Amino acid sequence: MPKLDLDAIPQTNATGYPPEFAGVVQGRWYRRLAPAAGLEDFGVSHVVLAPGAWSSQRHWHEGEDELVVMLAGEAVLVDDHGETVMRTGDVAAFAKNDGNGHVLQNRSDAPCTFVAIGRPADTACHYPDIDMHLFAGADGQKRKDGSEF
């Protein structure tokens, strides 16, 4: 069936971040829509950020394009160009390998909801503000020097 029942898709706030970097995403709740729909060529997540929560640590991907569509509420997009308020209906796109680290932060007093679309990639992910890096083909993040957390 093309229409997805969001309530039937498990919601989680799991993260692969090490504890020292995980606090800001504890209020991020997401559903992986692509597996539920049988989609294989790209990933889609339905994301709700509680007040104060971030979508991720600020990051950029070498081999993954990303697109975000705000469905409800308000978040602040923080990237190398500064800060941009994102409201219902706004769209942001992040081209792979552009070097522009980005994150959505919910600074409001109400939840916000968005859909994030990307492509599963086995390429590096850079985190410019913290000592963390996802190396291509690696199983989880490591410090920028390659050492384990």
Predicted regions and their residues:
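Ligand-binding loop in jelly-roll beta-barrel domains
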Residues: 38, 96-123
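Short, charged/polar surface micro-motifs in flexible loops or helix N-caps
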Residues: 50-54, 74, 83, 98-100, ...
